Amino acid sequence: MGSLCLQKLSAVERLFALESFELPEVPCSLSFHRHPEYKSITREANEWAFKCTRRDLSPEEKKSLLQWKVPMVTCLSTAHAPKENMVASAKFAWAIAFLDDPIDDNEVAATSYLDTVLSLCNGTASLAEVPDIVAYRACHDLMKDLRSLLQPELFKRTVSTVEGWARSISSDDLKQDYKLYRRNNIFILPLFYTLIGASFEDEDVESPDFVSAQNAMLDHIWMVNDIFSFRNEFYKKKLNNLPAVLLLTDPSVQTFQEAVNATCRMIQDKEEEFIYYRNILAANASRNGKDFLKFLDVLSCAIPANLAFHYASSRYHGMDNPLLAGGTFHGTWILDPKRTIIVSDPNRSNGAASNKLNQIQDLSKLI
C-alpha cells in the first residue's frame, strides 16, 4: 500500500509539471445527419443567445460566442425534426452553456444557484424575483418556449432531467463513483427530447436495454468532453477529468499518457456498447412506437455529433485557432493556456481510424 501511494505521489507531481501528451485518433463508426436548415437554425439560436446577454455586444464578442459553435450538436443530430423544435433545441444548448459556466468558474454558490434554476423551470419564480444574470434569463425564456412547444408529458420529463442534473451538481457525496457522477451531470438529454417533440411510453425508456444504450451514449459524450476539456481544466488547476482520475486511482496507470490512452480505449468501448444495445432495440422495433425509434436514432447521431463539436469548438481550443476550421486532429498536444497546439506526425496515422472519421472531416467545418 505504501509503495502504491508513493507511485501515485510521483505520478501527480509529474502531472502538475506536464507540458505535452499524445492525443490518439478517436475513431467513430456512427454517422450524424445534418439538418437541411442548419444555417437558419444556427443563426436564430445565436441571435437569441446574444439577446439573452442584454448587452450591446461588440463584433469581437459576438465572434467569440459564434466560435463556440454551440448549436452544432443539435444541427447534426437529425435531419427530420421540425424547424421550431430544432431552434428550441439549439437554444437549449445555449442555455446549458450559460448555466454551466458560472458553476465551472465558481462564480455562484452552487446550491442557491441551482435552486433558482429549478424554480424558473417549474414556474414557481418569476424573472423579476431572481438576480439579473444571463443564465437565469436564458432559462426563463427557454422554459416559456418549451411549455408551448412540448407535450405536457415530455415537458415534465425534460424538467425532471434538469432536476436530476441539479442534484448531481449540488451533491456533497465525495465518495460517489466519478464515472456515475459524470454520467449524471452530462446535461444533454433535454436537447434530444426537444428535437423529437413527442413523448414515449415509460416502458420504452425504462427498459434495461434502452437504459444501457442511453448510458453508453452519455458515457461516450462525457469521456470525449474529459479529453478535449483537459487543457482548460489543467490551467484552472482542476483534476475533474477522467485521465487525471485514472492516474490517481488506477494501480495499472502510472503515467498521464497511459491515462489518456486508457480513456480513448474506453471511448471506443462505449461506442461498441451503444451499438450493441441499439441493435437489440431496433430488432424489437415492431413493438415500439415510431417516435421512440426516432429518439433512438437521434441518440445514435449524438455520439459523432458531439465528437465533431469537440474538435471544432473554441470553448476547448481557443478563439481563432486554425483547428476550428473543421476536421479531426491527433498528435502531440502541447499545453498552452490560450489555445490548443497540435503537432501532427503523418507517419503515425491510423488508416482505419481516419476512414471512420471521414464524415467529421468533411462536414464539421460547415457548421
Could you say what each language-model-derived stretch is?
Residues 1-367:
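Alpha-helical, largely C-terminal catalytic domains
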